[in-house]
């Protein structure tokens, strides 16, 4: 029963890791997409150098804001990558622990089966001895 509880706890822990990792993965993908779109905008603006000369200061302010937003997204992306790596390591460690517990459970199950067989043999021997004692008791008062 204790091993079943451990396995259930393990399954709950794995689900918790998955629930944490999945949003980070989605956010990471979103950040990369956002970074790609921002880089495309920068590339398009750089390619059209004639139009860059005519951009108003309002557009320059927008570029500064976009650049700051890009930097913030990059920092967030790096943070999420580190957290994801840590979670992957924890998940790997937990998986190894779960594998070990499964092996222990398997061995314990085999051991219990062997013990059950031995108990059955001992019970059969006990019954045989009890029958023999009963037979001897029946013979001795008659003799």
From Swiss-Prot:
Protein name: Autophagy protein 16
Protein's gene: atg16
GO annotation, cellular component aspect: cytoplasm; cytosol; phagophore assembly site; phagophore assembly site membrane
Topology in the lipid bilayer: Peripheral membrane protein
Summary of the knockout phenotype: Impairs atg8-processing.
Keyword Lyase attached: no
Function summary: Stabilizes the atg5-atg12 conjugate and mediates the formation of the 350 kDa complex, which is necessary for autophagy. The atg5-atg12/atg16 complex is required for efficient promotion of atg8-conjugation to phosphatidylethanolamine and atg8 localization to the preautophagosomal structure (PAS). Involved in endoplasmic reticulum-specific autophagic process and is essential for the survival of cells subjected to severe ER stress. Required for meiotic chromosome segregation.
Keyword terms of this UniProt record: Autophagy, Cell cycle, Coiled coil, Cytoplasm, Meiosis, Membrane, Protein transport, Transport
Signal sequence, start to end: none
Quaternary structure and partners: Homodimer. Interacts with atg5.
Keyword presence, Phosphoprotein: no
GO annotation, biological process: macroautophagy; meiotic cell cycle; protein transport
Organism, scientific name: Schizosaccharomyces pombe (strain 972 / ATCC 24843)
Homology family: Belongs to the ATG16 family.
UniProt-annotated location(s): Cytoplasm; Preautophagosomal structure membrane
Stretches of the chain forming a coiled coil according to its record: 66-142
